[in-house]
Amino acid sequence: ASVIKNYQLELDYLDVGGGYYGIFHNAPTFDEYAEAIYESLQKQGLEKLTIIVEPGNALTAAAFSYYSRVIDTKHLPDCILLTTDGSRNDVDPFFRKERYMTEIHREKEEAEVVPLQIVAGATCLEYDQLFRLENQPELCVGDMIEYKNVGAYTLTLTPMFINYFPRVYSLSSDGMKLIRDKWTAKEYMQKSNI
């Protein structure tokens, strides 16, 4: 706000960008961000200036869950390797996350507890390991893994390497509605002149 005054700028609006984490514990709330921005502008007599906020990830990350299904299991001497129909590309396009908020949806209620399971994606890339389960009931083909709080950028940054774009559903009080069907080679090639 002081820069606006010092340089006598006449602005129609001020874009304060993004990077707000109001949904996470021990982070300022959206109200606290708004109050801090307003107080700074008010000190300079700019409280009527239009503010544009780009909260993106802070709002939409919590609005999305991503589901993948176990499609194969391989019993190795020291662990069970689980291959899913999803990929780390779909839940972590910047490859920075060390943990995911997950919930397992099992087809069978009871399963044997096993020492180590490694959940991997469907690509052949070495970084496509999603997480490890230690001393948990064994997952089987058909079990679903829900990744919570993903989606802010994953819908636009997911590469079409091995897997094409997944189905996208909207959930409301009226129920679930398919808003984008899963892509196939047909959609991938639709604008190509080969």
Question: Over which residues does each language-model region extend?
Answer:
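Active-site loop/helix belt of alpha/beta enzymes
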Residues: 1-73, 136
